[in-house]
Structures are given as C-alpha cells and as structure tokens.
A protein has these predicted regions:
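His/Asp/Glu-enriched, well-ordered alpha-helical/loop segment
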Residues: 204-205, 247-326, 338, 344
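Active-site gating loops and adjacent loop-to-helix segments of metal-dependent hydrolytic enzymes
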Residues: 57-92, 131, 154, 195, ...
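Divalent metal-coordination and catalytic microenvironments
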Residues: 6, 24, 40, 51, ...
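Active-site core of metal-dependent hydrolases
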Residues: 143-146, 154-265
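N-terminal metal-binding scaffold of metallo-dependent hydrolase/deaminase domains
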Residues: 1-33, 375
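C-terminal cap of metal-dependent C-N hydrolases
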Residues: 314-378
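Active-site loop-helix segments enriched in His/Asp/Glu that coordinate
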Residues: 82-157, 163-171
Length: 378
C-alpha cells in the first residue's frame, strides 16, 4: 500500500491524517501520520476544469477586440485561425495547454471542441499518453443541423457544446439538442455572456450545464436553480472583456457553480490561477469562503459522475494531488495562493508521479489511446 500524509480534504474540512491506496482505489483514511509517506502536505482530489476551448491555444498573438470579434462563430478570430492552421500546430498547442492544466493539479477537463469530426480527431491526438481525463463536447462544422454529421459526432464524443443560443437559428438548435438527448449524450451552451438571453428558451433545450450567465437576471438564476442546471463561471476570461461574474449572487440563488478557464488563447488552463482570481473578484461583491472556491474547482467531475463527491473517501479512485503547504486550519486560504511549484505529488489511477510533466509527445503515442471520461447518466 502507498500513502500520503498531512491534511486531507473530506468534503467539509481538512482532516489531519493519512490517505492510503492500492490497486487504484483509496482503501484507508486514518487520523495517524504515516512513518514514510510518499509526500506530505495538503491533500485534495484532482481539480476539474469545467470549461475549456483548448483548440484556440494555437492563437498566440496579442489580442484586442470584442467577444464577437475574437470568439463568436463563424468569423471570430479564433475560428479564422483554426480554419487555416496546420493540424500538427493545433495538436501541439492543445497538448501544451493540457500539460499546463495537469501541472496545475487538474485531473480532468470538459472541452468544447470546434471543427466537427476533424476537431475531435485533433483533440484526441493531443490527449494521447497524457494522464488526464477529458470529456469532449463537439459541435457541427456550421450553424445548421445535419443529422448525419451530428450522429457521427455523437458516436465519437460525450455530447454537444455550442457557442450560444443567439448564434443559432432557433429551430436548428432545438433539433441539435433533441438529437443529443435521443443519443443519451449531453448538451451544453454558453448563455448570457454577451447579452441577456431568453432563459426559458435555453432551458427548453434541457442543457446539462450552462456557461457564464454574466448578464442573467435574478429571475433567470432562480429558473436555473429550479431546473437544477449548474453554471460554469470563467472569471479571468470574462475580465478580459471587461466583465466579472457575480459569484455571491449565483450562490445565493442556489445554483451549483463550477469553475472553468474558457479560451486557451485568453487564459492559461490553470485552475490554480482561476481559483485565486475567482476569490478576489467575489470580494468585490461581498466575498465567498475560500472553501466554496475550492468546491467550484472540484465539482466539474460531476459531469462524468453526477454522484461524485468532492472529498476524499475510502472507495474512491486513487486520484490525488498533494501540495507541499502547511496543513493547519488555514488550508483553504493556502490553496488559493498556491502555485504549480507547490505541488509535491500527483496520483492518477493509483500511479504516483512527481511534477512537472514534460509537454513533448511521448514515443510511440500512435499505439496509445486517450483517457476519455465516460459520463454516467444523470
């Protein structure tokens, strides 16, 4: 059996003790400290990045312009760059972004993948050999519903993730969402990022989650809470465009909030940076506890397993991150100031490694398969 010691997060607080695992499963959590643990410090499950656009990591220029000019389909900058970029350049850029996420303690991502079937192939090549889970939400190559194309997409990914309700002809989007539901796959969309959108029309699509909700009213948020639809916030991306999510208001409405990093061309996919920034911008509107920010960064796992806990428990997969930080009563605050260099050990499927992970593609990756998350039904 292998063990780590310090303060482990049980879903409510940090308990001083030891976590032990074997055969890829956590088999003990004890109050005593191991004599020779693999690492000591603050112990948490891996972070889950609930919203990324990894493909636009290929865009490296300094950016200026509005949301529409940079990211809106079909003529936003990222779409123009992706359309003419070499496949290998896109793959390398996505792989660098994934390694950045891994080295910041992330164990899984939910990626919105542009480019139809070809886009899916590229992200799966980028994932080859990396010790991460990825839930990939594809989208059609255009803003129209083509049953054959969508059926092929849904056979190859975990669902559909689109840019916005207002970007699509309403009838086409309803067909797209219905087809995903019929296939037993997820449907998700950005909502009220640029302007307020019709929340009733959006919720009629039965989304698994929504992203942003910057311009949502209190009534809109109440409707989301009633429908039990989580909202992913991406504060650094929003701030780039001169906006910030009202985190306390989202929580007061009773919404389950997840944390993501959004476009890789705007923000590095580091949830450590996102957590710190989310905590700071929440203070502008009254603040939220540091523990709540950590919870947001862990809840994205519920996309693939709705019953997943955010704490470390016996019987859970042996997926852990150990930070070389003091494990006392201020553990939550310490995590919100943590940087990549503070990570002492990462455990994935019971296999422990010391960071950082190199970004170079390993030899023989053509024979490897990406570790794609398999979502259970809600």
């Amino acid at each position: 059996m292998q063990r780590v010691s310090g303060g482990y997060y049980d879903g409510r607080r940090f308990r001083r003790g030891t976590v032990g695992w074997e055969d890829g499963v956590i088999v003990e959590t004890t109050s005593g400290l191991a004599r020779e643990p693999l690492a000591k410090g603050l112990i948490i499950p891996p972070l889950w990045n609930a919203h990324t656009h990894l493909g636009d990591a290929v865009v490296t220029r300094e950016l200026s312009g509005s949301i529409e000019e940079l990211v809106a389909p079909p003529r936003g900058l990222k779409h123009r760059v992706l359309a003419r970029a070499r496949d290998q350049d896109v793959i390398r850029a996505m792989r660098r972004a994934l390694v950045t996420a891994l080295n910041a303690g992330t164990g899984g991502v939910i990626d919105f993948r542009e480019g139809g079937i070809k886009g899916l192939k590229l992200v799966y090549r980028a994932l080859l050999g990396l010790p991460t889970r990825a839930a990939v939400l594809g989208r059609p190559s255009g803003l129209t519903f083509n049953r054959r194309e969508v059926s092929a997409l849904l056979r190859a990914c975990d669902g559909i993730g689109v840019s916005s309700y207002i970007d699509w002809p309403a009838g086409e989007l309803r067909k797209l969402a219905a087809h995903a539901a019929q296939a037993g796959k997820s449907f998700a969309t950005h909502c009220s990022e640029r302007v307020r959108e019709d929340i009733d029309a959006v919720l009629e699509l039965k989304p698994t989650f929504l992203v942003h909700m910057i311009h949502a009213t209190d009534s809109d948020l109440e409707r989301c809470a009633e429908a039990r639809v989580p909202v992913v916030i991406c504060p650094r991306s929003n701030a780039f465009f001169g906006m910030t999510p009202d985190v306390p208001r989202l929580l007061r409405a009773g919404i389950e909030v997840w944390l993501g990093t959004d476009n890789a061309m705007i923000s590095t996919p580091s949830l450590l940076r996102e957590m710190e920034f989310a905590y700071r911008i929440a203070r502008l509107r009254g603040g939220v506890p540091a523990m709540e920010i950590l919870e947001m960064a862990l809840r994205g796992r519920r996309f693939v397993d709705p019953k997943a806990t955010t704490g470390i428990r016996v019987g859970n997969p042996a997926d852990l991150v150990v930070f070389a930080l003091p494990d006392g009563e201020h553990g939550f605050a310490s995590l919100l100031r943590a940087v990549e260099a503070d990570i002492a050990l990462v455990v994935s499927g019971g296999i422990a490694r010391r960071p950082p992970l190199p970004s170079e593609e390993p030899t023989g990756t053509k024979r490897l398969r990406p570790r794609r998350a398999q979502r259970t039904s809600r």
